[in-house]
Every structure is written in structure tokens, then in C-alpha cells.
């Protein structure tokens, strides 16, 4: 056998008078201790009495394993034991040795096990406290880390803004295009101009497309200057369509432009034509109704009679050389237009409106649109 050695009595062959019992060989077990079954020592000598599971291992309780790396089994606590230990922990985190002995006697647990449980419970409590207060502790201890946290928070808050940025940019681009290139605005009154109010109105009218309150603060800067800005393109918008189309189309374009822009200069210009009320919406309706008699009297003019600002454009078809000089002046005074008596008769109604604003706006515009007058 591998782990056994047989010893025979040397005197067996020498002394033949030995008893038959001496003739039997003696077998000694020389198996190393590390090959034996690992024995789990109790944490304390009282373990054998406290735990019923170890009652069968009572004989092995006094044995100590030769290998110190052998790990003992994990202690299983009952609900009653855990509840009692938790109550004691809430009363006092650090328990003295006499108190641990009392708990060991009450819970039928070894004193060393109770000591280890309190150590683990204190570490668990420490981890919980750190997990709850880690942002504040890190912010106060490390300024760089605090700056990174603030930057991340700012980036997360800025997320709602990008969807509104394209709309604001489009509104600004449309306003810039109309202001810089009035020629483009002639064909865009019904199409291009309404886009600017729709993008800028959510902040005030509260369209369903932009319910977020961020739209108000983002679009307000673009919406406020949009109202005073129309006076500059207002001249081309009111003049261009009438030069391009007939009297009926001119009146419809004027109604659309006045309704979309809602600028005061447009209302004041209409008052000089016989409209007493300086409202932004009512003049186009009155002018359309009153345009029929004027257009009948001035059948040769390509411009609707509702626009007396272009008074020199109606005679332009009849006499071309007289147009360039009196065109800007006719907006305020009806004297240069000998064929049109309507503005001169209804001039007292336009005294209340400020004429200098219309004169400054109308001066450069007719020069730009002379080709339209010649085509008409």
C-alpha cells in the first residue's frame, strides 16, 4: 500500500517460542494531515452549545486544522437576532465588551461573532452616508470637479434650446433678406412675410407648435424689432404689387400687406386717400370698396386708385417725363398730380398723420421699380 508500512517483528524468525499474537503485523497510518478532511473550528468554545447544527460535530470542535488558510463557514442569523442587533446598533454604534457578552448570552451567539457583526454594520453605515452626500463632499473638496459638474448641468439644461434655434435663424434670415433686397419682396408678400410672424408669434400668441416657455424669451428679441422694421420694406410692399398687377390685384396685395405688417405708416398713408379711421385692418377693406369708382375714372393707370402714394405712377403711363421728379413728393402733397383730384379733396383727413415718415421711405423706392412702371 502507498501510505502504509508493514513492520514484522525481527524476533519472529529468531525466536520461535513467540506467541501467535506476536506474529501478527502492526499497521500504522502515516497519511499526511493535509489530505484529511478539513475541519471547521468554532469561533469560540461555546459554539458547540449555541448552534444545534454543530451538535454532531462536537467531537471535532476541539480539533484545529493544520492549514490556517481554511475559511470558516459564514454565520447565518435569524430575523430575531438581526432585529435585536439592529436595535442595539441604533442605540450605540460601538458596543463594549461586557455589553457584547450580554448580547451573546441573549441571542445564543458567540461574542466574537457579535463583534464582527458590529464592525460590518459600521462599514455599511459609512458607505450609505458617503453615497448620499458624495456630490456635496466632492464639490467642497475639489473645485475642478465642482466645475465639471456645473458644466455638465449647464449642458443638460441647454438641451431644449436647439429645436428653436433653426426657427429663430430662419426668421432673422427672412428679415435680413427683405431689408437688404426689396426686389425679392415683391413676389413674397403672401408667401414669405407670413413666415416671420408665425415663427415669432409663439412667444405671444402661444401656438401649439411651440408650447415651451423658452420660445417666448428666444423669439421676443426677433419679434420686437420686426414691427418697426416693416416701415422700410413697407414702401416696396405697398408699391410693388400695384405696379405689377391690375387695380384689383393691387388692392388685394395692399390688403394682404397691411394685414400682415400692421405698421402705422401704412395706415397713415391710407388716411390721405379718404379713410378717416387710422386702423391697420379696416383701411384695406374700405379701399377695396372705394377702388371701383376710382379705377373707372382712371382706366389708363396700371395702379389701383386706392393707392394715392403712387399717384405719379398713374400719370406715368400717360406722360413718362413728368414722373421722376414729383414721385417722392406726391405722397405728402397732391399738387404734382394734376389728373388726380381725389387726394387733393381728401387731404384734410391726412393732416393728422405724420407725413415726414412717408416721404423719407418713399423717396428711394420708386427709382428702384421704374422698369415695372414702363412695362405697365
From Swiss-Prot:
Start-end of Polar residues biased regions:
47-60
InterPro entries according to UniProt: Even-skipped_HD (IPR052002), HD (IPR001356), HD_metazoa (IPR020479), Homeobox_CS (IPR017970), Homeodomain-like_sf (IPR009057)
Instruction: Name the source's superkingdom.
Output: Eukaryota
Matches recorded under SUPFAM superfamilies: Homeodomain-like
Q: Which residues bind DNA?
A: 70-129
Q: Region labeled Disordered — which residues?
A: 1-22, 34-67, 229-248, 281-376
Q: So what does this one do? A: May play a role in determining neuronal identity. May be directly involved in specifying identity of individual neurons. Pair-rule protein required for segmentation; involved in transforming the broad, spatial, aperiodic expression patterns of the gap genes into a system of precise periodic expression patterns of the pair-rule and segmentary polarity genes.
Protein name, per record: Segmentation protein even-skipped
Q: Which organism is it from?
A: Drosophila melanogaster
Amino acid at each position: 500500500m502507498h501510505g502504509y508500512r508493514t513492520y514484522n517483528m525481527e524476533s519472529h524468525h529468531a525466536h520461535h517460542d513467540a506467541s501467535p499474537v506476536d506474529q501478527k503485523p502492526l499497521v500504522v497510518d502515516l497519511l499526511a494531515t493535509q489530505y484529511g478532511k478539513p475541519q471547521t473550528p468554532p469561533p469560540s468554545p461555546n459554539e458547540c452549545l449555541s448552534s444545534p447544527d454543530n451538535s454532531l460535530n462536537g467531537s471535532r470542535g476541539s480539533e484545529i486544522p493544520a492549514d490556517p488558510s481554511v475559511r470558516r463557514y459564514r454565520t447565518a442569523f435569524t430575523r430575531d437576532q438581526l432585529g435585536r442587533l439592529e436595535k442595539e446598533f441604533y442605540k450605540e454604534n460601538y458596543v463594549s465588551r461586557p455589553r457584547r457578552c450580554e448580547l451573546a448570552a441573549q441571542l445564543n451567539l458567540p461574542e466574537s461573532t457579535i463583534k464582527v457583526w458590529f464592525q460590518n454594520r459600521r462599514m455599511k453605515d459609512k458607505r450609505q452616508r458617503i453615497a448620499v452626500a458624495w456630490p456635496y463632499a466632492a464639490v467642497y473638496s475639489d473645485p475642478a470637479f465642482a466645475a465639471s459638474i456645473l458644466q455638465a448641468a449647464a449642458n443638460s439644461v441647454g438641451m431644449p434650446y436647439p429645436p428653436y434655434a433653426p426657427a429663430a435663424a430662419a426668421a432673422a434670415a427672412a428679415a435680413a433678406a427683405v431689408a437688404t433686397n426689396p426686389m425679392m419682396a415683391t413676389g413674397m408678400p403672401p408667401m414669405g412675410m407670413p413666415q416671420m410672424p408665425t415663427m415669432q408669434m409663439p412667444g405671444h400668441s402661444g401656438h401649439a407648435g411651440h408650447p415651451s416657455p423658452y420660445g417666448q424669451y428666444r423669439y421676443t428679441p426677433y419679434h420686437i424689432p420686426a414691427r418697426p422694421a416693416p416701415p422700410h420694406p413697407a414702401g416696396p410692399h405697398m408699391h410693388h404689387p400695384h405696379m405689377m398687377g391690375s387695380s384689383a390685384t393691387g388692392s388685394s396685395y395692399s390688403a394682404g400687406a397691411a394685414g400682415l405688417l400692421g405698421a402705422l405708416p401704412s395706415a397713415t398713408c391710407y388716411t390721405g386717400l379718404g379713410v378717416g379711421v387710422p386702423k391697420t385692418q379696416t383701411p384695406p377693406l374700405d379701399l377695396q370698396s372705394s377702388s371701383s369708382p376710382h379705377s373707372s375714372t382712371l382706366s389708363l393707370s396700371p395702379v389701383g386708385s386706392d393707392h394715392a402714394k403712387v399717384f405719379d405712377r398713374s400719370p406715368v403711363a400717360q406722360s413718362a417725363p413728368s414722373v421722376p421728379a414729383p414721385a417722392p413728393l406726391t405722397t405728402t402733397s397732391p399738387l404734382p398730380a394734376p389728373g388726380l383730384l381725389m387726394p387733393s379733396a381728401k387731404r384734410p383727413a391726412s393732416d393728422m398723420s405724420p407725413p415726414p415718415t412717408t416721404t423719407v421711405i418713399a423717396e428711394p423706392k420708386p427709382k428702384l421699380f421704374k422698369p415695372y412702371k414702363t412695362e405697365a
